[in-house]
Amino acid sequence: MEILSAEFVVSNTKVEKCPQDNLPEYAFIGRSNVGKSSLINMLAKRPKLAMTSSTPGKTLLINHFLINKEWYLVDLPGYGYASRGKKQVEKIQQIIEDYILEREQMTNLFVLIDCRLEPQKIDLEFMEWLGENGVPFSIIFTKADKLTNGKVKDNVNKYLKKLTEQWEELPPHFVSSSEKKTGRQEILDYIDSINRSLKA
């Protein structure tokens, strides 16, 4: 699949205010500073589609982008911002949970993981929560350009091994670099395969 058009549609904090046209939605989420906005811009080939910032946690809304007039790419608020007050953290968490659990159009959730880091408790707990709630998700390991290919492979394998402690069957996973465009086609082809299966 190639992206021919990508346009911003709406930002909000309420699931009921999301688009009502029943197109499939692919949501992206991750911890602070995982490279989510850069990944979204890389996938869409639009450098400024999603707002990037050196300040973690700028995405505080559910952002819908219409892709090829066929499906939505959804940029969700991130989780795990230690610098935020308790009330704001709880508010963001509620926005995330409401969308993930109530949005029937969400076809797949991409969980972004910084491949440079050891498995983080907050990510593992979040994925466990997704599993408990039957949420279909995939993993995208980001920032692969920051390490050698061998180190990326080692870190990803270590992460997947950690997941096997909780999971009998591992979710699909991808390795990406927004700088080098690594993983772009694989992720888009995966989305395309799901879209095709929905039409079958």
From Swiss-Prot:
Cofactor: Mg(2+)
InterPro entries named among the record's database cross-references: G_ENGB_dom (IPR030393), GTP-bd (IPR006073), GTP-bd_ribosome_bio_YsxC (IPR019987), P-loop_NTPase (IPR027417)
Binding site for Mg(2+): S37, T59
Keyword terms: Cell cycle, Cell division, GTP-binding, Magnesium, Metal-binding, Nucleotide-binding, Septation
Residue ranges occupied by any EngB-type G domain in the UniProt entry: 22-197
GO molecular function ontology, one term from the record: GTP binding
One protein family per Pfam: MMR_HSR1
Any GO BP: division septum assembly
Superkingdom: Bacteria
Residues annotated as binding GTP: 30-37, 57-61, 75-78, 142-145, 173-178
Protein function: Necessary for normal cell division and for the maintenance of normal septation.
Family per record: Belongs to the TRAFAC class TrmE-Era-EngA-EngB-Septin-like GTPase superfamily. EngB GTPase family.
Xref: HAMAP family: GTPase_EngB
Entries under NCBIfam families matching the protein: GTPase_YsxC
Protein name (database record): Probable GTP-binding protein EngB
Organism: Phocaeicola vulgatus (strain ATCC 8482 / DSM 1447 / JCM 5826 / CCUG 4940 / NBRC 14291 / NCTC 11154)
Gene: engB
